[in-house]
Amino acid sequence: MSRSIKKGPYVHFKLLKNTNNLNLSNSKRVIKTWSRSSVILPSMVGHTIAVHNGKIHVPIFISDQMVGHKLGEFAFTRSFRSHAKIDKKIRK
């Protein structure tokens, strides 16, 4: 189920405050956040936000196609290591 329209999108208050301060000062610095559930707003476009994936902060440059999605969608928590390829020489 999607979120109710009357509630509006969820954005962590500190993340929103930091992006608004960067917009006012016209500076471009990386914002670190653990809030993967925050929705990307149009005021965040053009900024780089480092989202925590459980191990490190992954820097994500926000573009206008990302508006409306959540930050956690772009910082993957699992890394797939490919399965070992079986060599024909080893089989024999």
Swiss-Prot record:
Any one of the GO BP annotations: ribosomal small subunit assembly
Tagged with keyword Chloroplast: yes
Organism domain of life: Eukaryota
Transmembrane residue ranges: none
Entry GO terms, CC: chloroplast; mitochondrial small ribosomal subunit
Family that this chain belongs to: Belongs to the universal ribosomal protein uS19 family.
Name of the protein in question: Small ribosomal subunit protein uS19c
Organism name: Cyanidium caldarium
